[in-house]
Amino acid sequence: MLRMKVKKKQAAQRQIDIDTDSFKLKDQEEKLQAGRYIVELVSAVLAGREPDAKPEDLPVKAIYRMAKLHNLDCIVYDGMKRIAGEADADLMEEWANRNTICAAQGIMQQREAKNLVKELPARGIRVLPLKGSILKEFYPQTRYRQMADVDILIDRKNMEKAHTVMKELGYKYEGGDSEDTVDKYYKPPCVSIEMHSHLMHYHAENHKKYLDIWERCKEENGVYHMNWDDYYLFLMEHFAKHFNESGSGIRFVLDIYIFLEAKKKELHPEYLKKKQKELGLEAFCREMEEIAYRWFDGRPEIRDSKYETVILLAGIFGIRQWAYAGQQKKYLEKYKNPRIAKGMYLLGRLFPDSDLLLCELSVPPRLAGIDKHLILLFGRL
């Protein structure tokens, strides 16, 4: 019997579409200079060498602010304390205190994460630890990899059960995201947990390509782990998502370098290349890997490309105004008429959870061609 080969549909390669020119940041040149020097400080710490001298016109305070923005307080502090002068003593004392607090937070986060991956499976909830809690172990010191929160994937059907367990463990429910794929919890003094029901939001281009992630994992006592190829693919997918929405910072690029240095011998390049192409990430991965090694493998070489400018300025959470400008540009390209584009953009801001609501409204296939925001507007009315 003849079998026809069916080619998997490949996602279009993603393009940078961040309009950095439409919104200039306050003190943008100083922030760029601080970002460049942070790369130098991090590179020096990783290599165990003395950092190059700080530019004379760059205040230490600007470096401190940008280190916090990029969530790199601890590793940058270890570089900065080697060259700070007497004039910087007060600020460096403040920074040292923050370094201690961040390190303590990291210890508490890891302790809680280990407890959760024990308690949740014991209640019949399978778990897949994500992102930072795994990466921390690959950094020279775990405190260097700071986390805003601990991310854990569970089954959607177990969200309510997990809610009960979290309350029993002393967590307060902080709400969910607009697409109802994340429940957020907080435990004093400083531990935030995000329980994910999906790796990607419903509206994400590659959402369906991660639905089988559980089947691709290895399990041990109810705790699941991705193979390193899939872990790296998701790391890059997550980076690309943030980058294309509003930019994302130095920490993401550092994660790439740290991970590849730790695990590249266990990766399968041909498989990764094939999957990156299917996900539309091939060019993005190639570019970011190249930047990661130029910046952190030896003395940094920064070329100030658009990619690099975005990374140096964006910080860990990106620039809100860049995201708005990018959304408006996409609406204008779609509708051509500026007034219509502006109206549809405003509707989009009113209905950020539109894809989920479309499912809840059971929109029939025959209406698929009608703009979703118009459907939602009348659906809610």
What are these regions (language model features)?
Residues 2-148, 154-381:
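Conserved NTP-donor binding/palm subdomain of two-metal-ion nucleotidyltransferases/polymerases, i.e.
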